[in-house]
């Protein structure tokens, strides 16, 4: 089982957790750790330390943070460097969190991260590209009817 700590600037991790709850319901071992204006990296590391106390020893731990190289990322990196059962992915969004929640009971952490790499490219979509595909398909259908 993989426990998840979502972290990021402001209320972002709290909102992300609430949004996932609207879709999947309440999840165990999903912890939101916000980083607020005026807090330093030591404060955030203490929040992580407190969150980790609530996670069973046998669980792997995935930190999902908003920005690569930001304070939430840097604070988590110090824990990951000390514990091989932990890792992190930056650039979290709702589709990525939902993917994690749907797979975390079935995959090991490294396998889950590999899935996320592939999935993250698919979660970013441009509407006009899809509309163009529909338009082209409709034109092809009309031409076939003639």
From Swiss-Prot:
GO terms for molecular function: kinase activity; protein-N(PI)-phosphohistidine-sugar phosphotransferase activity. It is found in: Cytoplasm. InterPro entries: Bacterial_PTS_sugar_comp, PTS_EIIA_man, PTS_EIIA_man-typ, PTS_EIIA_man-typ_sf, PTS_IIA_man. The keyword Phosphoprotein applies. Residues 1-124 form the PTS EIIA type-4 domain. GO terms for cellular component: cytoplasm; transmembrane transporter complex. The EIIA type-4 domain is phosphorylated by phospho-HPr on a histidyl residue. Then, it transfers the phosphoryl group to the EIIB type-4 domain. The phosphoenolpyruvate-dependent sugar phosphotransferase system (sugar PTS), a major carbohydrate active transport system, catalyzes the phosphorylation of incoming sugar substrates concomitantly with their translocation across the cell membrane. The enzyme II LevDE PTS system is involved in fructose transport. LevD and LevE act as negative regulators of the levanase operon. They may be involved in a PTS-mediated phosphorylation of a regulator. This is PTS system fructose-specific EIIA component. It comes from Bacillus subtilis (strain 168). The gene is levD.
């Amino acid at each position: 089982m993989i426990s998840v700590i979502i972290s990021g600037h402001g209320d972002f991790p709290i909102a992300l957790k609430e949004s996932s709850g609207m879709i999947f319901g309440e999840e165990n071992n999903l912890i939101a750790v916000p980083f607020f204006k005026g807090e330093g990296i030591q404060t955030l590391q203490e929040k992580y330390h407190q969150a980790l106390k609530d996670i069973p020893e046998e669980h792997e731990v995935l930190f999902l943070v908003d920005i690569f190289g930001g304070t939430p990322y840097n604070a988590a990196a110090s824990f990951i460097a000390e514990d091989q059962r932990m890792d992190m992915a930056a650039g979290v969004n709702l589709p990525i969190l939902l993917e994690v929640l749907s797979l975390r009971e079935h995959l090991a952490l490294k396998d889950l991260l590999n899935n996320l790499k592939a999935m993250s490219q698919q979660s970013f979509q441009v509407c006009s590209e899809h509309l163009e595909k529909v338009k082209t398909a409709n034109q092809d259908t009309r031409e076939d009817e003639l």
